[in-house]
Amino acid sequence: MSAKLLNSNLWEADPELFDIIVKEKDRQRAGLEMIASENFTSVPVLQCLSSCLHNKYSEGMPNQRYYGGNEYIDEIEILAQNRSLEAYRLKSEEWGVNVQPYSGSPANFAVYTGIVEPHGRIMGLDLPDGGHLTHGFFTATKKISATSIFFESMPYKVDPKSGLIDYDKLAETAKLFKPRLIIAGMSCYSRCLDYKRFREIADANGAYLMADMAHVSGLVAAGVIPSPFEYCDIVTTTTHKTLRGPRAGVIFFRKGVRSVKANGQKVMYDLESKINQAVFPGLQGGPHNHAIAAIATAMKQATTTEFVEYQKQVIKNAQRLCEGLISRGYSIATGGTDVHLALVDLRGVGLRGAPAERVLELCSVACNKNTVPGDISALNPSGIRLGTPALTTRGLKEADIDKVVDFIDRALKIGLEIIKVSGLKLVDFNKAIEENAEFKKKIENLKEEVENYSKSFPLPGFDKY
């Protein structure tokens, strides 16, 4: 076998692919990354992901493998488990953890598989109101998420005027629906969740309470927002958003006494084996050991003072972003933010999510279109979601966010000019840009400003790619 095939660098072995990767690196460096679920991970995490650990199969749990040669893989996974507990200040006699899920969606589905019977009942925040697909989303005509296909799901919602979760209505619906599991989690909700109230509702209906803290797990680790662990039976998370680790998932589960009966008999948690067996062999095969190592080093970073200061700055930047946009006439769902993201309602200025996302993208500001409270269709959303984790990782602070607000405002104003010609349909919007030299020029000029500004901030990772 040719040693060259095995030992060449990517840029030598596959320059076509490498050139595309370099273009993506340049895009990340030159643009303002404001997708709330994205971040720039550290060099140690990237080194784990590209290490020899990629080569090893290790089905099963540490010291209970179906393959030989896992002595050091076991050490790494146990280290990742211990550090995950330490990052959230958890006692091993009270909490267990599984670090094998490939990402957040598999982690959530493993919980459902383990503790909810087929066609059992689940409640989660509705997707148009800020929930996640895996929390059971369906429409009047179609079950969209596998959660809604294999389980019976019932959404709870926000108040359409305030944008805040209607806990009273949630309690009322839960009393009628009697879910096996209630999910306290979100993908686009800018306020801290009331885990105590969730716990009360779950207890009133004999339900398990699961927090999906994928978006805010870094903030929780840093102690800058309330923790779900005091009140929840299960906590799931991704590790690549505010936690700034690899693309992976983690499941925390309670151990020990769950409750005490009137006669004094203790009722014990039985989550550990159910969840572990749901992950493997229920849903997955061999775990991704390179990702588990990356979880271990990311969790170590999460216990540092530097990480805590970073998370504080993420929130400061998000709040400054809201203040700046409000001062320029934009509406923010819930009136502001407690976390890392802002949901901008564009109905008041005559825009929609899709054209807003597109014009910002053309100006090198990356975000995503998003439903806002009161939207009827998830296919035609009225807002955009903006996040500060990635910008904060690059070193932006409040004064820099003021500049970012200016860029966003100017891009959206260009979008409004285009809409006057094209209307709100995205295909017509794009066509108007292509056919109008003045629109093109305005976009190109703003893009150049944005990219020159963005390039002045460092980008973590490898220099070349």
Curated annotation (Swiss-Prot):
Tissue expr: Highest expression in the ovary and testis. 6- to 7-fold lower expression in hemocyte, silk gland, midgut and fat body.
Keyword Methyltransferase recorded: yes
E.C. no: 2.1.2.1
Cofactor: pyridoxal 5'-phosphate
Superkingdom as given in the UniProt entry: Eukaryota
Pathway as given in its UniProt record: One-carbon metabolism; tetrahydrofolate interconversion
Effect of mutating H132A: The kcat/Km for tetrahydrofolate is 7.4-fold lower than that of the wild-type
GO biological process entries: glycine biosynthetic process from serine; L-serine catabolic process; methylation; protein homotetramerization; tetrahydrofolate interconversion
pH dependence of function: Optimum pH is 3.0. Stable under acidic conditions. Retains over 70% of its original activity at pH range of 3-6.
GO MF: glycine hydroxymethyltransferase activity; methyltransferase activity; pyridoxal phosphate binding
InterPro entries from the UniProt entry: PyrdxlP-dep_Trfase, PyrdxlP-dep_Trfase_major, PyrdxlP-dep_Trfase_small, Ser_HO-MeTrfase, Ser_HO-MeTrfase-like, Ser_HO-MeTrfase_PLP_BS, SHMT-like_dom
Temperature-activity profile: Optimum temperature is 30 degrees Celsius.
Result of changing H135A: The kcat/Km for tetrahydrofolate is 1.7-fold lower than that of the wild-type. The kcat/Km for L-serine decreases to 32% compared to the wild-type
GO cellular component, one term: mitochondrion
Pfam family, one: SHMT
Catalytically driven reaction(s): (6R)-5,10-methylene-5,6,7,8-tetrahydrofolate + glycine + H2O = (6S)-5,6,7,8-tetrahydrofolate + L-serine
Top-level class of the enzyme under EC nomenclature: transferase
Record-listed N6-(pyridoxal phosphate)lysine modification sites: K241
Subunit structure: Homotetramer.
PANTHER family: SERINE HYDROXYMETHYLTRANSFERASE (PTHR11680), SERINE HYDROXYMETHYLTRANSFERASE, CYTOSOLIC (PTHR11680:SF59)
NCBIfam families (UniProt xref): PRK00011.1
Protein's UniProt name: Serine hydroxymethyltransferase
Organism per entry: Bombyx mori
Lineage of the organism: Eukaryota, Metazoa, Ecdysozoa, Arthropoda, Hexapoda
